[in-house]
C-alpha cells in the first residue's frame, strides 16, 4: 500500500519532505507525530507523512463535543491501519473556561497530545495548518491592527505550552492550499469528513474564510509568503533587541535601569517590555497603553502601567509599584 501511495503522491511528497527539512529550526529528536481529525487537511498530512522520509505515528483527539466525533476517530483509525501508520485515539471531556469551549478544547487537546508525544518518543507533532489558514490568520490580525509579531501569524516550527505540558509543533503544509490538500486525498482514493463548525458564523475566522473564497484573485500563497517575511523580520528584530538588552538594561536592587538614547522606537518598545516583564512576569502588555507609557517616559515623567512604575530621564527606571491599600470598611 505504501509503495503505491508513494508513487501516486510523488510530486507532492517531494515538496513535503523539503518543507519539513526546511522548517526545522533545531534537530529533531524522536519520531514525528501527526494530528489527524479526519478532515481533508489532516488526512492529506497523514497520507504524506505515511510515505515521507520520517518515522511517524498518528493521534486523534475525541473531545466528546459532537455526537459524530467518536465515529470520525474510528474512521481515522481504519485509514491508519490500511496505510500502516500506528494510531491512537485520545478521549476527553471539555469544561468551558473563561475563554469559551473552543479555546478550552484547543488547550486540552494540545495537553493530551503533549502527554502522548512524551510516551511515544515523538519529538514534534505535525499539524495540518495550510496556506489558506495562514492567509486567514494574517488578514484577521491585520484587521485588528496587530504588529509585526501578530502578522507573523502561524509559525512553521514552534514550542507551545498547554496545561504545563510543552509540545513542539511543525506545520509543513503552509505552502499547500486547502484545495490542493483535498486533491491529494481524492487522488489517493480516500474520502474525508467535514466539520460543520468551519462554517459557523459565530467565529471571526469563518468570515475571513468566506472573504477569501469569494475573492479568487487573492493569492493565498502570496499572503502566506508575506507572513513568512514578517516571521523573518520578527526574528531579526528580536535578535537585535537581545543584544541591546544585554548592553542597555542593568539591575540595581529592585530597580531596572534602561539607557534609551538613540534607539528606534520599535527596539525601545521591546526593551521597555522586557524590563516590565522581568519585574512582573506579565507578557501580555501591548497596545495603546504601552505607547502612552513610553511617550510619558520620553517626556521625563513618572508613570505607572500594570503594577510597574517608570521614571523618565537620562536613564529610565522601572520598579514594582507598592501594593494598593485595601479599603477599610
From Swiss-Prot:
UniProt keyword terms in alphabetical order = ATP-binding, Cytoplasm, Ligase, Nucleotide-binding, tRNA processing
Q: Tell me any Pfam family this protein matches.
A: ATP_bind_3
The chain's disulfide connectivity reads none
| Domain of life, per lineage | Bacteria
Q: What enzyme class is recorded for this protein?
A: ligase
Q: Which Gene3D superfamilies match?
A: HUPs
Which InterPro entries does this chain map to?
Rossmann-like_a/b/a_fold (IPR014729), TilS/TtcA_N (IPR011063), tRNA_Ile_lys_synt (IPR012094), tRNA_Ile_lys_synt_N (IPR012795)
Might you name a Gene Ontology BP term for this protein? tRNA modification
In which compartments does the protein localize? Answer: Cytoplasm
Positions binding ATP in this chain are 37-42
The record lists the catalysed reaction(s) as: cytidine(34) in tRNA(Ile2) + L-lysine + ATP = lysidine(34) in tRNA(Ile2) + AMP + diphosphate + H(+)
Protein EC = 6.3.4.19
Q: Name one GO cellular component term.
A: cytoplasm
Listed GO MF terms: ATP binding; tRNA(Ile)-lysidine synthase activity
**Does the UniProt entry include the keyword Chloroplast?**
no
Q: What does this protein do?
A: Ligates lysine onto the cytidine present at position 34 of the AUA codon-specific tRNA(Ile) that contains the anticodon CAU, in an ATP-dependent manner. Cytidine is converted to lysidine, thus changing the amino acid specificity of the tRNA from methionine to isoleucine.
* Protein family (similarity comment): Belongs to the tRNA(Ile)-lysidine synthase family.
Domain comment text? Answer: The N-terminal region contains the highly conserved SGGXDS motif, predicted to be a P-loop motif involved in ATP binding.
Q: What is this protein called?
A: tRNA(Ile)-lysidine synthase
Amino acid at each position: 500500500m505504501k509503495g503505491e501511495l508513494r508513487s501516486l503522491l510523488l510530486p507532492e511528497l517531494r515538496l513535503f519532505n523539503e518543507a519539513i527539512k526546511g522548517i526545522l529550526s533545531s534537530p529533531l529528536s524522536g519520531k514525528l507525530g501527526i494530528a489527524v481529525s479526519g478532515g481533508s487537511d489532516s488526512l492529506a498530512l497523514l497520507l504524506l507523512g505515511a510515505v515521507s522520509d520520517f518515522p511517524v505515528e498518528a493521534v486523534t483527539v475525541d473531545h466528546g463535543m459532537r455526537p459524530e466525533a467518536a465515529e470520525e476517530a474510528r474512521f481515522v483509525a481504519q485509514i491508519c491501519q490500511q496505510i500502516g501508520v500506528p494510531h491512537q485515539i485520545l478521549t476527553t471531556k471539555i469544561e468551558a473556561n473563561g475563554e469559551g469551549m473552543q479555546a478550552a478544547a484547543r488547550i486540552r487537546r494540545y495537553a493530551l497530545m503533549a502527554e502522548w508525544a512524551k510516551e511515544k518518543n515523538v519529538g514534534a507533532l505535525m499539524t495540518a495548518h495550510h496556506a489558506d489558514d495562514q492567509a486567514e490568520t494574517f488578514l484577521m490580525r491585520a484587521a485588528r491592527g496587530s504588529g509585526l509579531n501578530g502578522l507573523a501569524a502561524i509559525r512553521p516550527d514552534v514550542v507551545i505550552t498547554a496545561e504545563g505540558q510543552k509540545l513542539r509543533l511543525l506545520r509543513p503544509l503552509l505552502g499547500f492550499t486547502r484545495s490542493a490538500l483535498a486533491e491529494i486525498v481524492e487522488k489517493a482514493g480516500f474520502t474525508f469528513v467535514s466539520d460543520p463548525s468551519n462554517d459557523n458564523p459565530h467565529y471571526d475566522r469563518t468570515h475571513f474564510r468566506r472573504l477569501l473564497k469569494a475573492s479568487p484573485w487573492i493569492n493565498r500563497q502570496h499572503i502566506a509568503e508575506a507572513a513568512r517575511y514578517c516571521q523573518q523580520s520578527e526574528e531579526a528584530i528580536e535578535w537585535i533587541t537581545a543584544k541591546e538588552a544585554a548592553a542597555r538594561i542593568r539591575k540595581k536592587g529592585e530597580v531596572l535601569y534602561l539607557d534609551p538614547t538613540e534607539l528606534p522606537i520599535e527596539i525601545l518598545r521591546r526593551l521597555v517590555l522586557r524590563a516590565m516583564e522581568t519585574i512582573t512576569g506579565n507578557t501580555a502588555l501591548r497596545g495603546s497603553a504601552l505607547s502612552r507609557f513610553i511617550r510619558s517616559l520620553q517626556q521625563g515623567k513618572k508613570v505607572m502601567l500594570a503594577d510597574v512604575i517608570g521614571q523618565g530621564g537620562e536613564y529610565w527606571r522601572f520598579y514594582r509599584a507598592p501594593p494598593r491599600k485595601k479599603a477599610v470598611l
